[in-house]
Amino acid sequence: MKKLKHSILSLLLLMGACIVSCSNDDGQTSSTDPDEVGGESFTIPVSSLRLRDPFILVDKKTSMYYLHFNNNLKIRVYKSKDLSTWKDEGYSFIAKTDFWGQQDFWAPDVYEYEGRYYLFATFSNAGVKRGTSILVSDSPKGPFTPLVNKAITPSGWMCLDG
């Protein structure tokens, strides 16, 4: 029960930090108090996160939390063991030049299904305003690739969240 309360409190703090920050920077921060797990340093405190449209995947296979968020026309991922300190894992998705969506990267959600990871996100281009795409990876941190190179929602629909 204590662990559940701690997780809920940490999640609330994370969401509060995300709402307050809403910045356009790259999300990079640093700390002088690293938390080491299995040789990895989790040095980014939740209170310093500056990001938009976060989604947290609880991955039972790796016993980690994965935080995906949009970041300057890319999707970035952090991971944590406790929701309090985080490690920057880089980008989970960087669109190639032939990817249909070239603007408005928005609200990624990630789910595990039958051993693979699926990222749902909203993108736009000149002909499709806010269409949803599904991306797939064998890892919760990516890299994700498009299942199909087009929006899965009708072009007349405005889909705000993947």
Which role fits each region the language model picked out?
Residues 22-162:
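Carbohydrate-active catalytic/glycan-binding domains of CAZyme proteins
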